């Protein structure tokens, strides 16, 4: 499947649908080994910027970075997972995970109250991740789309905040990435 986002993919990369990630690509032979560390860079934001979403957007951006750090630490694939390149020990071989939010909506409680079970008013976040080596060559690319995925977001979303629901979605995104990486590392 080609990516449905308007963001171009790196040359030679074609995303395929994963079990829980909407798009995945892994460089031939890459299995998340051979690196001492990974730097999880601050996510870029390339979605529509709405003036009523400033605070929620900032929370989501920080939440994505935090969730990805936790996810990659839990894989055990890297000795060190950091957020800045200057935190990597000198002489270490490291990769960088660059992420971009390419679609974002904070959601709306009123719509969730009346039709949230059908997806109305749910927050939306779509993220592209690109793990690159020190020369910028892509090693792994993923795309994840979340929109009020949990049962509580659907059933009781009208009584919950946009931030709470989106935080669950972001945590779920991290868990799905962790599980994919762990499966790849273990050969499954």
Can you say where each PLM-predicted feature lies in the sequence?
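A structural "domain/chain start" motif
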Residues: 1-66, 156, 182-188
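Surface-exposed short loop/turn segments
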Residues: 4, 84-138, 150-160
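N-terminal post-signal-peptidase region of extra-cytosolic proteins
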Residues: 17-28, 77-85, 109-116
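Sec-exported extracytoplasmic/periplasmic mature domains
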Residues: 45, 69-78, 106, 178, ...
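Extracellular-facing segments of soluble proteins and assemblies that are Gly/Ser/Thr-biased and enriched
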Residues: 59-92, 100-105
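A structural microfeature
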Residues: 140-142
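A short acidic/small-residue loop/turn micro-motif
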Residues: 146-148
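Compositionally biased, intrinsically disordered linkers/stalks adjacent to structured regions
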Residues: 155-188
